[in-house]
Design a protein with these regions (language model features):
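Compact structured core domains
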Residues: 1-3, 9-14, 19-22, 34
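Short alpha-helical segment immediately N-terminal to, or the first helix within
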Residues: 15-19, 66-70, 80
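Residue at a beta-strand N-cap/secondary-structure junction
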Residues: 23, 71-72
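Basic/polar phosphate-binding segments, predominantly the helix-turn-helix DNA-binding elements
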Residues: 17, 23-59, 78-107
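N-terminal positioning helix adjacent to the helix-turn-helix/winged-helix DNA-binding module
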Residues: 4-12, 48, 57-60
Length: 124
């Protein structure tokens, strides 16, 4: 049953988190989980509230956000998180976050500059 597949779903999540930067197919995920493709999609959606593909995209976007926070370019973030091209990356990033990758990176840059402008509090 779908509710009995928690271990398989968690195994799939761990696999996605470890391999998000490369092309992952539903076939590959189902083999990792030891379930048919349809059983995996049903169990995953029931356990996580999203499809395995949507989960993969969320992991990729989360990692891309972390890279942008560190000042990595949008193009480099796209490549490092497994997107086939920058346009595809920008569309997904904007859909997930409400910001373009460039706008997100700029927000982090502005926040960093703000913190750098605050005088040091050397009280020790």
């Amino acid at each position: 049953t779908v509710s009995a597949c928690r271990v398989e779903v968690e195994r799939t999540c761990a696999f996605i988190r470890s391999h998000y930067a490369r092309h992952i197919t539903l076939e590959e995920l189902s083999l990792q989980a030891g379930l048919s493709k349809s059983a995996l999609v049903r169990a995953f959606a029931k356990a996580k509230g999203v499809t395995p593909y949507r989960y993969l995209m969320a992991v990729r976007i989360s990692e891309a956000r972390r890279l942008l926070e560190r000042g990595v370019s949008s193009a480099e973030a796209a490549v490092e998180t497994g997107f086939s091209d920058q346009s595809h990356f920008t569309n997904y990033f904007t859909a997930f976050t409400g910001l373009t990758p460039g706008a997100c990176r700029e927000l982090f840059r502005q926040e960093w500059e703000m913190w750098q402008s605050i005088p040091s509090l050397d009280v020790l």
